[in-house]
């Protein structure tokens, strides 16, 4: 059975690249482009891991992460351009399991996914 991943980012090219790379590794990938859509998808389906951007339309990644934590322990990796130490600390305090800053190396992202799952 393949691993199910939710990728959440409002930058379509980033989503497309991550999706392609993870699908090459045999993962089943769903995509969301804003915070509300991500939260709905996380409530409707069971994912093995969620890659979550911080700066999203409608609802930011911190809020999405916090709300997902109210009903799920799914691993969440923040994947964001916000690289300040305080942002990283907040992400982890809101319930993220890991925090990767953009620009990122897709091999590092895959390695962290495998380490968490």
Question: Model features per residue range: what roles?
Answer:
Residues 9, 53, 80:
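Active-site residues of response regulator receiver
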Residues 43-47, 67-74, 94:
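Conserved phosphotransfer cores of two-component systems
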Residues 45-51, 56:
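Active-site beta3 strand of CheY-like receiver
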Residues 34-37, 60-63, 68, 87:
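Acidic catalytic/metal-coordinating carboxylates
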Residues 13-24:
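Charged docking surfaces used in two-component/phosphorelay signaling
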Residues 26-33, 41:
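Short hydrophobic/Thr-rich beta-strand motif most characteristic of the beta2 strand and flanking loop
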Residues 15, 57, 84, 102:
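The feature encodes the CheY-like receiver
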């Amino acid at each position: 059975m393949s691993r199910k991943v939710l990728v959440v980012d409002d930058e379509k090219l980033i989503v497309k690249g991550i999706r392609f790379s993870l699908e090459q590794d045999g993962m089943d990938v769903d995509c969301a482009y804003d915070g509300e859509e991500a939260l709905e998808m996380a409530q409707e389906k069971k994912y093995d891991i969620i890659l979550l951007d911080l700066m999203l339309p409608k609802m930011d990644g911190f809020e999405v992460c916090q709300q997902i934590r109210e009903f799920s322990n799914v691993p969440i990796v923040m994947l964001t351009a916000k690289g300040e130490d305080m942002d990283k600390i907040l992400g982890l305090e809101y319930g993220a399991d890991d925090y990767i800053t953009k620009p990122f190396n897709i091999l590092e992202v895959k390695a962290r996914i495998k380490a968490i799952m």
